[in-house]
């Protein structure tokens, strides 16, 4: 069993490429998808401007109000069902879920978040409807893998205390699911070829080397590298950070294209 995360730019620009790669992959697979660029498009269609905030660490992320949460859930559902439709139409058995379905991924709403305002000053604001993942129902997800070839998961968690879906980070969803099912491999496929150091792709890192390297690379990628090291420590055999834009992206990554952390 492997877990594959495809980033929003891959979803927008190279989805067919990834679907063809899923069709070629012979084993069971969990596919976690992003879709931020498409969410922004639909937000604008609904007459609103998407809102982004920047953390003190320099990480830019979507701010999700109640109105934007509705658009986020609708858009992610559309992406999810489009992927499932294509997989089934081309011969794979597949099911599409969010973390809300069956309470498969439980989260908690971020009550407050710290941001940098337009003057570069730290400020605490209401957290909106973004969340942090608390638990994954590994038994439920594993039971689904016995029924289908591919599970497609949207990055939406369930906050049972506030009875609301939550926008959760797609990488976090993939890491947590991979840890829960003890995946043989976790693939993070985006629009970069791997972890870059001095303009060259780093081919292989131990978890210790990954933690050390994370201090030398930019925000965003450093978070992926740290989460990759944590995943390996918690039972995932290896994490591969690579490109979803290359031909047969999944098998290419498994064959050594990208950065492997193990």
Swiss-Prot record:
GO cellular component: cytoplasm
Catalysed reaction, written as an equation: [amino-group carrier protein]-C-terminal-N-(1,4-dicarboxybutan-1-yl)-L-glutamine + ATP = [amino-group carrier protein]-C-terminal-N-(1-carboxy-5-phosphooxy-5-oxopentan-1-yl)-L-glutamine + ADP; [amino-group carrier protein]-C-terminal-gamma-(L-glutamyl)-L-glutamate + ATP = [amino-group carrier protein]-C-terminal-gamma-(5-phospho-L-glutamyl)-L-glutamate + ADP
Localization annotation: Cytoplasm
Gene Ontology molecular function: acetylglutamate kinase activity; ATP binding; N2-acetyl-L-aminoadipate kinase activity
SUPFAM superfamilies: Carbamate kinase-like
Major localization class: cytoplasm
TM annotation in the entry: none
Binding site for substrate: 35-36, 62, 167
EC number assigned by the record: 2.7.2.17, 2.7.2.19
Xref: InterPro entries: AceGlu_kinase-like_sf, AcgluKinase_fam, Asp/Glu/Uridylate_kinase, LysZ
Record pathway: Amino-acid biosynthesis; L-lysine biosynthesis via AAA pathway; L-lysine from L-alpha-aminoadipate (Thermus route): step 2/5; Amino-acid biosynthesis; L-arginine biosynthesis
Superkingdom of this protein's organism: Archaea
Keyword vocabulary terms for this entry: Amino-acid biosynthesis, Arginine biosynthesis, ATP-binding, Cytoplasm, Kinase, Lysine biosynthesis, Nucleotide-binding, Transferase
GO biological processes: arginine biosynthetic process via ornithine; L-arginine biosynthetic process; lysine biosynthetic process via aminoadipic acid
Keyword check for Kinase: yes
Residues the UniProt record annotates as site (Transition state stabilizer): 5, 224
Top EC class for this record: transferase
Family: Belongs to the acetylglutamate kinase family. LysZ subfamily.
Primary role: Involved in both the arginine and lysine biosynthetic pathways. Phosphorylates the LysW-bound precursors glutamate (for arginine biosynthesis), respectively alpha-aminoadipate (for lysine biosynthesis).
Protein name: [LysW]-aminoadipate/[LysW]-glutamate kinase
Source organism of this protein record: Metallosphaera sedula (strain ATCC 51363 / DSM 5348 / JCM 9185 / NBRC 15509 / TH2)
Organism taxonomic ancestry: Archaea, Thermoproteota, Thermoprotei, Sulfolobales, Sulfolobaceae
Primary gene name: lysZ
């Amino acid at each position: 069993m492997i877990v594959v995360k495809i980033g929003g730019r891959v979803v927008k620009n190279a989805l067919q490429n990834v679907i063809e790669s899923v069709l070629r992959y012979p084993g069971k697979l969990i596919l976690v998808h992003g879709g931020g660029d498409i969410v922004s498009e639909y937000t604008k269609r609904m007459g609103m401007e998407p809102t982004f905030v920047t953390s003190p660490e320099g990480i830019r992320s979507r701010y999700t109000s109640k109105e934007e949460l509705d658009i986020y859930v609708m858009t992610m559902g559309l992406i999810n069902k489009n992927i499932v439709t294509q997989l089934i139409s081309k011969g794979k058995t597949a099911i599409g879920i969010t973390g809300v379905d069956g309470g498969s991924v439980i989260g908690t709403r971020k009550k407050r978040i710290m941001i940098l305002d337009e003057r570069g000053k730290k400020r605490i604001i209401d957290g909106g409807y973004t969340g942090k993942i608390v638990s994954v129902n590994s038994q439920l997800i594993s039971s689904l893998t016995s029924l289908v070839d591919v599970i497609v998961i949207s990055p939406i968690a369930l906050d049972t205390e506030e009875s609301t879906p939550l926008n959760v980070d797609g990488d976090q969803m993939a890491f947590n699911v991979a840890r829960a099912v003890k995946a043989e491999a976790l693939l993070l496929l985006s629009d970069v070829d791997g972890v870059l150091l001095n303009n060259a792709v780093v081919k292989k890192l131990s978890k210790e080397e990954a933690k050390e390297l994370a201090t030398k690379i930019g925000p965003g990628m450093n978070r992926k590298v740290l989460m990759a090291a944590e995943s390996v420590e918690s039972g995932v055999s290896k994490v591969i950070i690579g490109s979803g834009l290359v031909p047969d992206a999944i098998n290419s990554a498994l064959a050594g294209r990208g950065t492997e952390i193990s």
